[in-house]
Amino acid sequence: MTNFVFIVADDLGYADLGCYGGREPISPVLDKLAANGIKYINGYSNAPVCSPTRFALMTGRYQYWVRGASEEPMADNAIGNPELGLFPELPTLPSLLKDKGYHTALIGKWHLGYRPHFGPEKSGYMHHFGPMSGAVGYYSHTGTNKEHDLELD
């Protein structure tokens, strides 16, 4: 089986990386990875913030057809809300790959709904290392609710 890795970054512009025309040598490892692999040059995000984009990438659906894509990142009541997140019954890229025998892992923030109703393992990931929320202190690992938010399974 072919291995592949999706690298998704928040707030990254088209020409921020050297492999896409950036002038500053800030991404030599990613540039080398792109030079020795497949580099896509025609992909766009149709949302200005991160969570709706991840909803779309994970499901292959227009993100605003999936309840929670526009509400979850902004809602004060998102934590523990059973209606704001990526519903486990929706097929996702990781769940389809897992069904085909791939090992799946998410390294980084989930920010697609909170436990116990949602989570990476409910959407096809076998392993997760990172926060559930979208804003976590770099050193404290606490979320906006001031609780510890860093998982390793």
PLM region descriptions:
Residues 1-153:
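Formylglycine-dependent sulfatase
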